[in-house]
Amino acid sequence: MKILVPATSANLGPGFDCLGLSLKLFNETQIQKSGVFSISIGGEGSDNIFLKKNNIFVNIFYEIYEKLSGKKDNFRFIFQNNIPLSRGLGSSSAVIVGAIASAYYMSGFKVEKERILDEALIYENHPDNIAPATLGGFVCSLVEKNKVYSIKKEIDKDLAAVVVIPNLAMSTEQSRQALAKNLSFNDAVFNLSHASFLTACFLEKKYEFLKFASQDKLHEINRMKNLPELFEVQKFALENKALMSTLSGSGSSFFSLAFKDDALALAKKMQTKFKDFCVQYLEFDDNGFEIC
């Protein structure tokens, strides 16, 4: 079997831990039953010995496979990782969702996306990345009694993303330590109103309002201080026809959205201006993970 799991960008400014969308940048994993266990890694993490000795995908896969099938089989895993690690593009969510879905498939169980999403919550306790990795598109999610409730909206085909990826890795745990311990009443209202309005913009295709709807007072500024160049990235994007420009997840990547022609032009300009960063033009994925 082969499974493709997309990269994701979460929060989208004010939608902390609840909003996210799916990008056409995929981790690809092939799994086959084998006489002996083996693992090979290409792309991101290929030079990391730890990922071969203690691979999270493999650990989750075996945990669920053995629970579902009651068997202890050996498998051959071939990873082609295209999602940058610890850059705020959902690399950990792609691993979690991919491992769970693969285990269900290889156990002979029906792969139901709602079930996969609920199980993924065991390993990642906020749904902003795991939901779009599972469902695709733009997704608004919440958790109630250990169940994920999500509403998905397909993203307009005329839109594309420009993602700026710094060399600095930034784990979610590390990034959360930069957050303020308390939030003022006014700032809480600001984020609630902006997250709600941002969601409505995607649902109703009111993209002209995204620039101010995507503003945040909860997490972005404190996280961006770890890499001050990101303030310049955001300013440059918004001055060059980006409809919105926000920190991607917990960082360090930065996500900008624009109409396709504008996004292509923006990507070229950013490649010239921010030579030390990787800049990628990406279209949006509306399917979530797919098993081939």
From Swiss-Prot:
It comes from the Bacteria. One of its GO terms (biological process) is threonine biosynthetic process. It is an enzyme of class 2 (transferase). It is found in: Cytoplasm. Its main location: cytoplasm. Keywords: Amino-acid biosynthesis, ATP-binding, Cytoplasm, Kinase, Nucleotide-binding, Threonine biosynthesis, Transferase. GO terms for molecular function: ATP binding; homoserine kinase activity. It catalyses: L-homoserine + ATP = O-phospho-L-homoserine + ADP + H(+). The keyword Iron-sulfur does not apply. It comes from Campylobacter jejuni subsp. jejuni serotype O:6 (strain 81116 / NCTC 11828). This is Homoserine kinase. It holds the Pfam family GHMP_kinases_C. Catalyzes the ATP-dependent phosphorylation of L-homoserine to L-homoserine phosphate. NCBIfam families: thrB (TIGR00191).
